[in-house]
Amino acid sequence: TLVSGDNNQALAIGGITNGVTNLELTNAYATIANHGEYHTPIFYTQVIDHNGNVILDNTETMETGREVLKDTTAWLLTNAMQDVLTSPEGTGGSANPGNTPVAAKTGTTNDDRDTLMVGYSPYYTVGFWGGNDDNAIIRSTSFSNRVWKQVMYRLHEGLERKNFTKPEGIVQAVVCKKSGKLAIPDVCNAD
């Protein structure tokens, strides 16, 4: 439940008074990755032994999703979060696995007690939280980016490179940096 003090930037990474679990936060990002379609989260789909035999099968519990975001809204969020990993100004450049398109959000609490990296590709959504059980200050906050990068890299080894799909209804245009209006060639370029 949100309270009035929860209206801040930390909301995007679960920084609310009563908190969210890593599973809930990761599932929120999975909903964006699924074009705005929400599915109740499950921890695993199958457990397979070293011989390739399915020991546990959780695929029957997977439900049909329901739309909670427009696909266009989900794509705009994805497009913005791709900059976190690809833009020189982005805070997650060191987390880009390089072998798949990704969108993500980094996060660190003001007092360096928690670090977070949550994001997705067209295939997988991964959330990573790092901190101490006793809420002590952590020595480094960049390790969440490194762990997330390695997990995403390994998950995508051998997979066909797939881009995020832009839905119908998205209109792209060049905007003049000075006026904020549509750019006019030779009058106001997008610089």
Locations of regions flagged by a protein language model:
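A penicillin-recognizing enzyme superfamily signal
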Residues: 18-191
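Mid-domain, small-residue-enriched loop/turn segments at the edges of structured enzyme/sensor domains
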Residues: 1-26
